[in-house]
Amino acid sequence: KSFKTVFIETLLLYMVIPRKINFTRLGRYGTHCEQCFRQNFTKKFDWLSYNLLMADRIFDKLDRKAIAIDPSYISKSGKRTPWIGYFWSGCAGQVKRGLEIMGIGLIDIDKHDCMMLRAVQSADTVTLANRGATLNDWYLKVIEQYKEQLLPVSKYIVADAYFSKFSFTQGLHDLGFHLVSRLRDDSNLLYLYQGEKTGKKGRPKTFDGKIDVSNPDHSR
């Protein structure tokens, strides 16, 4: 009961407190003390299940839905912040020092709306290197962690062109999802060879030239 009260108050305070929000300001503007907010923030909370219940009330069950994923850069200075590192900032168009979160949302295609379900902080490159993993491996691990809750909602995951890689697409397929995205600007597309076999020794010809996306050969 006490956690529920603090939880509701915290949501209200996040909407009304101007500028920076921390435990000191929560205690100043709220009815509970700073220590109370600190203690309750250490407790685990299933945000994904909570937001899925909210989505059930907002979106119609018969509507077409898809899962959206999108990493977001957060500006952050300092040296002791866990997993601070260099991440891509879409707004700046460059890699910047700070934090990154992996956002997971639920798209209602018929309502043209999206609701945030979960945000997971991305590990920095040093941590990933020590684990022998890449950032794409981390993204797949996050989706795998929540797949039991996401698959009943939708098997389609929508993402930008960064995720249009074989390793990521295959990883999603192994988890039971399908990726909806666009090809990267540097994609290497090839025509399949449709001619007759030569009968010569060696591996049969598989591809027949590179595709010029600005002038594709429609006869093939």
Question: Can you say where each PLM-predicted feature lies in the sequence?
Answer:
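Gly/serine-rich nucleotide phosphate-binding loop at the start of the catalytic core
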Residues: 1-47
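Active-site-proximal, Lys/Arg-enriched surface segment
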Residues: 13, 40-112
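Short loop/turn segments at strand-loop or loop-helix junctions that form parts
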Residues: 69-72, 117-123, 184-185
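An internal, acidic/charged active-site-proximal segment
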Residues: 124-220
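Short, conserved acidic/polar surface loops in the N-terminal third of protein domains
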Residues: 77-83, 114-117, 131, 169-170, ...
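Electropositive, glycine- and tryptophan-enriched low-complexity nucleic-acid-binding patches
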Residues: 25, 36-38, 90-153
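Short, glycine/acidic-rich beta->alpha junctions
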Residues: 18, 47-50, 96, 161-164, ...
